[in-house]
Amino acid sequence: MHARVVTNQIQPGKMDEWVALIRDSVVPSLRDEAGFKGFVVLTNAEAGESIGYSIRDSADDMVASEASGNYQQQIAKLGSVLAMPPVREAYELTVLD
């Protein structure tokens, strides 16, 4: 499996809105993409930080997701709560237990 990891700095007082946007817009948009397995979001409201993990079956599924333009559409919806542009990285995911 593979994961796209997106690190975000959230504006002060906007974490609840951030989580709602992820839950109500981002995750539903990902469900229709090939190879989508799930989404995990970690939040630290005190620090205004959030890390999102989008899990895919394969590297090819991640490439197809990037090419679809969905990421850019979702970031546009999230712009009102972001303090700065997100940082994206890709990893191979190994589940040990």
Q: Residue locations for each model-derived region?
A:
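Glycine-rich beta-strand-turn "strand-cap" elements at beta-sheet edges
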Residues: 2, 7-11, 37-47, 73-97
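Short, surface-exposed ligand-recognition loops at beta-strand->loop->(often short) alpha-helix junctions
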Residues: 9-22
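Residue-level signal for secondary-structure boundary sites
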Residues: 14-16, 60-62, 96
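Intrinsically disordered, low-complexity segments enriched in polar/charged residues with Gly/Pro
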Residues: 14-17, 27-29, 39-41
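Glutamate identity and glutamate-enriched acidic tracts
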Residues: 17, 33, 46-49, 66, ...
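An amphipathic, aromatic/His-enriched active-site/gating alpha helix that lines ligand/cofactor pockets
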Residues: 24-25, 30-37, 55-89
